[in-house]
Structures are given as C-alpha cells and as structure tokens.
C-alpha cells in the first residue's frame, strides 16, 4: 500500500510539472546600459540623465516628468505591479511615481516636450502619481487627474536614504507600498486600470533605479526542474524508510 501511494504521488508530480510557469515581466530597466535606457524612456520636462547606472533628474523645478516610451508599453496592460527604488538627492520634496498615464500630461505652467506618439493621439487624458514627501516634504498622497486619488499618509522622505516603492494596479483598485509596508489601498474603477508608468520630481533632484513592471503571474521564472528534483528527493527519502 505504501508503494502504491508513492507511485500515485510520482504521477501527480509529473502531471503538475509538465506545465512550466513563466515570468510575466512587462517592462524593466536597471540602467546598466545608457544607450538601451534611452530607448525606453521619453522625458517630458527636466534634466534627466543616465549616470552611475541610475536615472537622475537634476533640475530643481516643478513638474519634471519622464514616461515609458511607446515601444516598451502595451496599452492593454491594466493589471500590473510597478516597482522602483528612489533616492532623493536635494530639494524641497520627495518622489512622484507615475502610473495609469494616458494622453497629454498636465503642463502646470511648464513647456512640456511632445509626448510619445500614442499618448499624443489619446483623446482623453489620465494621470496619476504617488506624491511621496509632497507639500514641502510633510505628507504623501496619490493625486489623480481623471480618476480617483487618495492614500493620504504622513510619510516623508529623508534625503540620501534609498526607498523601495511599489504600486499594485488593477482594473478596480490600486495599492501603494513603501519599504514593504502597505500604506493604503484605494478602490478605483473609473478608468479600468489602463495607462503607462513614469517617473517625476517636484523642485527636487532625485535618482531612480531597478524599475520593473510585471503582471499578476509575478516577475520570477518558476523552475519546474527545481520542483521535480526537490519532490523526487522527498519521495526517495520515503522509499528508503
């Protein structure tokens, strides 16, 4: 009877591991290759530079923005997690992490460069950003033009410290996470979760790194070979008992 149970388990393992789980990375940039990074980003305003394997924005003026280029974004993506590391260098505030961006971005008194072609042709504008350390670095909040803002918190940003920033975007909601701690989750079905991501600053110099956007299946490739070897070791141990 024991042998029969083990054989059944072997068959189940083989059935499960015939399907390989793939990673679902939509976009990523670690800025190791400036020439490649130049293709991935479209700066709208500010002094954006690829240096020291990071993406720097060095102008101390409001509304400095850069979005992912057309070639690296699929407008159908409406369910994604966006992660980035941020480090504020100097200035008045912290970070502006853009998501759900479509159409023309708010100029806010600045002469923005022409946006990516697809964004330029999108009739209805939509813009979200997680304002971290905003209002003179006194608080944080998701602001939205065309959708629903929220996620108010007392989070401020310390210059020179690295921050792990994550936004989980779905067609019905978005959740913002700072240094692995969930800050807030906001229900928002107004725009179905569509729109690309970007980076921005407000009267602040900052640098960004390790940008990744991935789908619901996650960013890591699950190795079926590792699963088989681990499970077989367990089965072998039982056979020897």
PLM-predicted stretches and their roles:
Residues 67-74, 151-157, 198:
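Beta-strand-rich interaction surfaces with strong enrichment in secreted/lumenal proteins
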Residues 177-200:
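Short, solvent-exposed beta-strand-to-loop segments that form ligand-recognition rims
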Residues 9-19:
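Bacterial N-terminal signal peptides
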Residues 34-66:
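Extracellular glycan-recognition surfaces and repeat-rich motifs
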Residues 161-175:
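Localized edge beta-strand/strand-to-loop motifs within extracellular or lumenal beta-rich domains
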Residues 22-43, 223-236:
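Extracellular carbohydrate-recognition regions
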Residues 31, 209-213:
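Extracellular beta-strand elements of beta-rich domains used
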